[in-house]
Amino acid sequence: MRLAFWLYEGTALHGISRVTNSMKGVHTVYHAPQGDDYITATYTMLERTPQFPGLSISVVRGRDLAQGVSRLPSTLQQVEHHYHPELIVIAPSCSTALLQEDLHQLAAHSGLPQEKILVYALNPFRVSENEAADGLLTELVKRFASPQEKTAQPSVNLLGFTSLGFHLRANLTSIRRMLQTLGIAVNVVAPWGASIDDLRKLPAAWLNIAPYREIGSTAAEYLADAFAMPALYEAPIGVEPTLAWLRSLIEKLNAAGAERGVAPIVMPQLNAFSLDGLSAPSGVPWFARTADMESFSNKRAFVFGDATHTVALVKFLRDELGMQIIGAGTYLERHADWVRKELEGYLPGALIVTDKFQDVAQIIDDQMPDLVCGTQMERHSCRKLDVPCMVVCPPTHIENHLLGYYPFFGFDGADVIADRVYLSCKLGLEKHLIDFFGDAGLEYEEPEVSAPSEEPVALSVAPNDHPSPEAAAEAVVIAEEGEMKWSDEAETMLKKVPFFVRKKVRKNTETFARASGASMISVDVFRQAKESLGG
């Protein structure tokens, strides 16, 4: 086990509670030591919903262990008395695994009807957030889905939308809008907002939509095997993928409708999918061909995240914005083979598979891309490196749980992603222009006072002192041990380089100087390095 700080995936409890907290009438009881109910704070801080998380803790204490008693039966009774849930999910902890407690036996001692209890038996040492969430959703579907009459008109289930999902509500709204445009009803969304009765109705739909590789795809596979329900697994992220997704959706539903004698669904004019119903559904195809965006064809991008968003963003950046992909990776080893297959021909090297954020930060430091699409961890790393970064998947922070409409799915989502790519790369230029030319009197003017330097220098000069040219020429900036020395004039030239590529230029210049045998970087060395690197 590693110390649980800055991990890409949460614990098994995190995944379990994401599913149960999404549902109506479902409560989680976590059998664990005091303090392990920290997860409730995560939902109240990030989810921005009026409901309090449906999670209680059955405390495992040393005194109870010494006496040979357990609090789990009484906790289950209290939950039943206070909340009256339709289902109680009992989640094991590392402590219960070490103690080898029989949770089924303890639950039976509560006196509650066993059909109201689900002991989700997994190994909390080996199973992490996404696998636990996907497994629990599948277990619930297996337990409650029952044969149903198909709906009279085309309908679909939306699977895998869970609490704390990335841009969850906006993505749902985007998909609902596209389905409504096609005249397709939503039978059930699960687990988000679903009740136990909703799970029973799942087989009534004509088709299952499971756009997330991490959560929901296994449940869709079970429904395909048990109830012969077709499924659509692709994520509609980007303009071309959304068009392909719509065509596949219509094809699958028309095949099911032909067996029932229902009139086929016809793809409408594309402007029917736009927000105003008049214009093109997305501005990305036009925007990508503007002079402003064509400069992106020379920009280098690095993508790291979960399976679904890594694949989608790599394809979007290269195929629709024309950016160069210098590398990509995922922290989900169990989905790495699928990611490799999907990105065949897109990557210049091997797919990076790691769950250590330090490794990813080192790759970013070595490559210094123009844009990083990653997680909250990459956002932190890129701030230290002055590299533009946009968060595209979990883990996230409050900035990615917005009240407004910012989907990643559909045509609307393509516009949102393109805007974020553009702003992430371009806003740095504004700061550089202000650094270079000053604030142009936008705030105040102090002609007598020079602006403070962004970077410390070794030479200290009093306000009225004027060092001689010889002293200025000899003054150098003393770098950290093991780094090259820079003359004042070379440092001044370096500061004219935009801040968002300054570190890369410094690093490349020092590499050139070492290879050339120079002991100090002067203006001449700096210019030679620039010429050799094609600057």
UniProtKB/Swiss-Prot annotation:
Keyword Iron-sulfur belongs to the record: yes
Residues of the active site: D292
Signal peptide interval: none
Cofactor annotation remark: Binds 1 [4Fe-4S] cluster per heterodimer. The cluster is bound at the heterodimer interface by residues from both subunits.
Enzyme class: oxidoreductase
GO MF term set: 4 iron, 4 sulfur cluster binding; ATP binding; metal ion binding; oxidoreductase activity, acting on iron-sulfur proteins as donors; oxidoreductase activity, acting on the CH-CH group of donors, iron-sulfur protein as acceptor
InterPro entries: ChlB/BchB/BchZ, LI-POR_suB-like_C, Nase/OxRdtase_comp1, P-CP_red_C, Protochl_reductB, Protochlorophyllide_Rdtase
Keyword rRNA-binding part of the UniProt annotation: no
Residues given in the record as substrate binding sites: G428, L429
Pathway the protein acts in: Porphyrin-containing compound metabolism; bacteriochlorophyll biosynthesis (light-independent)
Names of the cofactor(s): [4Fe-4S] cluster
Keywords from the named record: 4Fe-4S, ATP-binding, Bacteriochlorophyll biosynthesis, Chlorophyll biosynthesis, Iron, Iron-sulfur, Metal-binding, Nucleotide-binding, Oxidoreductase, Photosynthesis
Biological process according to GO: light-independent bacteriochlorophyll biosynthetic process; photosynthesis, dark reaction
Enzyme Commission number, as recorded: 1.3.7.7
Binding site for [4Fe-4S] cluster: D36
Reaction catalysed by this enzyme: chlorophyllide a + oxidized 2[4Fe-4S]-[ferredoxin] + 2 ADP + 2 phosphate = protochlorophyllide a + reduced 2[4Fe-4S]-[ferredoxin] + 2 ATP + 2 H2O
SUPFAM superfamilies linked to this entry: Helical backbone' metal receptor
Subunit structure: Protochlorophyllide reductase is composed of three subunits; BchL, BchN and BchB. Forms a heterotetramer of two BchB and two BchN subunits.
The family this protein is said to belong to: Belongs to the ChlB/BchB/BchZ family.
Function description: Component of the dark-operative protochlorophyllide reductase (DPOR) that uses Mg-ATP and reduced ferredoxin to reduce ring D of protochlorophyllide (Pchlide) to form chlorophyllide a (Chlide). This reaction is light-independent. The NB-protein (BchN-BchB) is the catalytic component of the complex.
NCBIfam families: DPOR_BchB (TIGR01278), PRK02910.1-3 (NF002789)
Protein name, entry field: Light-independent protochlorophyllide reductase subunit B
UniProt lineage: Bacteria, Pseudomonadati, Chlorobiota, Chlorobiia, Chlorobiales
